[in-house]
């Protein structure tokens, strides 16, 4: 079975782009932008020979240098596996429900979340209620269903984030699917021990105006199964994941092995020598150079049978999924005097390489 699986899979050639190494031009461009300059200044060696770097400036530089190894910016995301998690309605009002999903140990270790789908069973509207509604409100038969991620903060306050929203008809019934991938991404960012995943489901009027006030009151979602008592209508959370053992990157490249088309996605070390750049002379005081990295190699592609469900996703590519900043000490000339200044250039060094699909959602960070 394993050999058959590998026969289905494809390998793509390395692509230049998000995982490419930082170039001299990019460093210069970022530095000019940070200092709001149009071109690199020309400084004489006499301007910097006798200039001492104060202790507080060097301390600031060292602190940023240490922090750059801890602070990372993320960017990246299929499904070899999916799991269903049964949820329960914790609280129910006229048009709002709060779903609670126990998530611990639901996501396999060393896996990548591709998509999370919330499935709610819309119950059919009784015929008598439907006929009465059509007689009183003939202009609109739809309601808006909104899914929000709810976070309970340590101080007891609540914060919500909009996840998905769509219109449903009161004439329909059955399973409705909502994309809640971003909510699970938010949940994964919580510190341990994590609280359960809380999803707030709101049913509202389609729009303001006469004839629309009661449509949303007829939309009901099953909380404890279908009328047959088999529990098939309760809320379900499908988690689609990939095993990164097969579909992820391998970490750092082996320096003893040359990179080829068949090399699995990895981070390759490179050194950018700032001292050898004419424009940096007498301008950049620290560092003399720095280790930079690029993401090289190929990523295992999913067989067509698994990609049909996600037509919006392109091929999996080897890209930089985490970047760090690059602190520098530069010479700044003001009023005939030259002084040292610390700057930090964001997203200048590749920290982690990953296999990600073109077109996949870039997870937002929690800002609630």
From Swiss-Prot:
It comes from Mus musculus. This is Left-right determination factor 2. Belongs to the TGF-beta family. The gene is Lefty2. Required for left-right asymmetry determination of organ systems in mammals. GO terms for cellular component: extracellular region; extracellular space. Residues 22-77 form a propeptide. Pfam families: TGF_beta (PF00019), TGFb_propeptide (PF00688). Its main location: secreted.
């Amino acid at each position: 079975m394993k050999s058959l699986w590998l026969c289905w899979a494809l390998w793509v050639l390395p692509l230049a782009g998000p995982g490419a190494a930082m170039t001299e031009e990019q460093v210069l461009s970022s530095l000019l932008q940070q200092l709001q300059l149009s071109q690199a200044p020309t400084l004489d060696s006499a301007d910097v020979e006798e200039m001492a770097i104060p202790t507080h400036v060097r301390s600031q530089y060292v602190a940023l240098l240490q922090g750059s190894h801890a602070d990372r910016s993320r960017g990246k995301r299929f499904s070899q596996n999916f799991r269903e998690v049964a949820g329960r309605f914790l609280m129910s009002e006229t048009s709002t429900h709060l779903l609670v999903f126990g998530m611990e140990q639901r996501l396999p270790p060393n896996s990548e979340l591709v998509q999370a789908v919330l499935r709610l069973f819309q119950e059919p509207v009784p015929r008598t209620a439907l006929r009465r509604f059509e007689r009183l409100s003939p202009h609109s038969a739809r309601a808006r269903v909104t899914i929000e991620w709810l976070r309970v903060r340590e101080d007891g306050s609540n914060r919500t984030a909009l996840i998905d929203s769509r219109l449903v008809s009161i004439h329909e019934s059955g399973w409705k699917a909502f994309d809640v991938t971003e909510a699970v991404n938010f949940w994964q960012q919580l510190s341990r021990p994590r609280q359960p995943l809380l999803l707030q489901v709101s049913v509202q009027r389609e729009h303001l105006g006469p004839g629309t006030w009661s449509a949303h009151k007829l939309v009901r979602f099953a909380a404890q199964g279908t009328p047959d008592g088999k529990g098939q209508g309760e809320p379900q959370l499908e988690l689609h994941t990939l095993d990164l053992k097969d579909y992820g990157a391998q970490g750092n490249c082996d320096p003893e092995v040359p990179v080829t088309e068949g090399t699995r996605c990895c981070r390759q070390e490179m050194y950018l020598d700032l001292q050898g750049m004419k424009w940096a002379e007498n301008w950049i005081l620290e560092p003399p150079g720095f280790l930079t990295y690029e993401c090289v190699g190929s990523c295992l592609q999913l067989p067509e049978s698994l990609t049909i469900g996600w037509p919006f996703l392109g091929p999996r590519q080897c890209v930089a999924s985490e970047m760090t900043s690059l602190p520098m000490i530069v010479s700044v000339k003001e009023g005939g005097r030259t002084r040292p200044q610390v700057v930090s250039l964001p997203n200048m060094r590749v920290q982690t390489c990953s296999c990600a699909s073109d077109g996949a959602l870039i997870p937002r960070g929690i800002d609630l």
